[in-house]
Amino acid sequence: MSLFVDTSVWYAAADSSDTGNARAKAVLNSDEPLFTTDHVLVETWTLLRYRIHRHAAERFWEGLRSGTSTIEPVGTADLEAAWQIGLSYRDQDFSLVDRTSFAVMQRLGIERAASFDDDFAVFRFGPRRRHAFVIVG
């Protein structure tokens, strides 16, 4: 099974003072194939850069470059799907990165998400929006 990793888990694993640090590290050290998007990479790098230090951001990126996770590019079709998600969930404040993550996960058939972000638990997909992601972490 594949596991999509959200910014919240990448960040928590890099920040030793984060309350989710141990859980995040445990998830990332599992034997499951990990996936993330280029948008999550940029969002995480930016958070690490400004909240911790540039060195933390570079270590994170270096880890991804070394194969820690498959980095899936967000394409034009994913952006359109993300737009449609926004239209369908007007009552939610999903970020653009979350919406593109949902779109990529659906495209790749990934139903498991490592996230501390409640939006991943709220989002529903499939016919009549009956399916939810399995949240790990």
Question: Model features per residue range: what roles?
Answer:
Residues 1-36, 49-62, 129:
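Short, well-structured N-terminal submotif of metal-dependent ribonuclease cores
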Residues 29-32, 86-92:
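A short glycine/serine-rich beta->alpha loop
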Residues 30-34, 68-70, 109-111:
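Short active-site oxyanion
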Residues 68-89:
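Acidic catalytic patch
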Residues 102, 106-137:
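Acidic, PIN/NYN-like endoribonuclease modules and their adjacent C-terminal/linker elements
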